[in-house]
Swiss-Prot record:
The gene is LEA1. Keywords: Leucine-rich repeat, mRNA processing, mRNA splicing, Nucleus, Repeat, Spliceosome. One of its GO terms (cellular component) is U2-type prespliceosome. One of its GO terms (molecular function) is U2 snRNA binding. InterPro entries: Leu-rich_rpt, LRR_dom_sf, RU2A. It is found in: Nucleus. This is U2 small nuclear ribonucleoprotein A'. LRR repeats lie at residues 20-40, 42-63, 65-86, 89-110.
Amino acid sequence: MRLTAQVINEAPEILNPEGKLTLLLRDLQITELENLAITQNKYQVIDLSNNDLISLGNIPKRFNNLQCLLLSNNNISYIDDESFPSDNHITSITLFNNNIYQFQKSFKDKFPKLETLILLGNPITEMENYRYFIIWLIPSLKVLDFKKVKQAERKTSEDMFGTNRDEFNSLAQQMFKNENTEIKLDGKSDRQVKNFVKKMTDEERQQLLKKLETATSIEEIERIENDLKEGAV
C-alpha cells in the first residue's frame, strides 16, 4: 500500500503513556515512506510497526518535533543516506525484527541526538563487536537493545576504534566489510523472536512484541529487560 495523503489524514492519533502525540500507521502493508510532510511536524511519535518498509528514509527536514520512530516488524535493510536528514531531533528508534545486516558510515552523522536504539532481530547483531561498534558510531546512545550503555563499554569502544570519530582505523574499516558476506535475510515471520525468546509460548511472544513496539522511554525499556531476565512477560 502507498502512504498517501489520504491514508495519513485518516490515520488515528493517540497520546501514548508518556503523553506524546502519536500517529498510528501500523499494519498497513506500507512499502515506502512518503508524504509525511503533510503532518506539518505535528507528531512526537510515528508508529510504522508491522509494515513492509525496505529502507528508512524520506523523513522531512526540520521535523524537530519528531522524537521517536517505531519500526518493528518491517523489512528495513538500510538507512537511505540521501533522504534521511542529519539535522533530526530523533531520540529513540525501535527497529526490532528487521533486516539490517551491515554498518553504514553515515550512522555517525545521521543520529546526533539518538539515545535509545533497538536492533534486536536484525542480522547485524550477530557480527563480532557489534555492540561496541554501534556505541562508538553513535556516542549519544544511552540504551542499546534494552541494556544501558556503560562507561566501561564506551572506553572499550574507543580503545578498539579510536577516539577520533572522523577517522576509521583498520578495525573500524573491517566492520564495514560485511557487504561481501553472504547472509540469509529472513522474512518477518521467520525472524520474529527466533533467537530471543525461544522458550516462550506464542501468546507470550505476541505480548513481548507489543511491548517492544510501544516502548519509548528508558524506564519502560529497563522494566521489559528485567521481565525478560526473570522469564516474565
